[in-house]
Amino acid sequence: MRTVLLSSCAIVTLGVLAGCSSSSEPEAVGGITECTKEALATPAQDSATALGAENVYSIDTLECADGWAVTSGILGPANAPADGPQGAPTNFIFEAEGQFWIPKATNQVCGTFNPDDPEAYPADAVIPEALYASGCLS
């Protein structure tokens, strides 16, 4: 009797496990992005192009903290004269979501600016405090 009971439990367990592991859904493709200039080059250029179709952006510096990134660089027209201004210093803020860098607007992530204490990190800021100055104050 005990052998029959153990065999029955084993068969039921195998059936349950087989049901859990078989699926017609494809497995999710995931991954985590890296915080490098190379990984942020395309998202930063896409942000520049969103501001103007002819814009180009070159990343000079990159700061990263807690799944967030701030790029600092020069934003300007692709046809800027070689002997003239190339563009303006510009920062872009990104948040990592899996394998992608998602652009974030300062008004959505920097919180409420305090003119009496301009360098204070706002309580309602979403961006990490380590990136607040470079992403929100410059």
Identify the role of each PLM range:
Residues M1-A10:
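N-terminal export and membrane-targeting signals
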Residues S58-E63:
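Short amphipathic beta-strand and strand-loop transition segments with alternating hydrophobic
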Residues S21-S23:
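Bacterial signal peptide processing site
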Residues V70-S138:
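Extracytosolic low-complexity repeat regions of secreted or lipid-anchored proteins
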Residues V16-G19:
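C-terminal motif of bacterial Sec signal peptides marking the signal peptidase cleavage site
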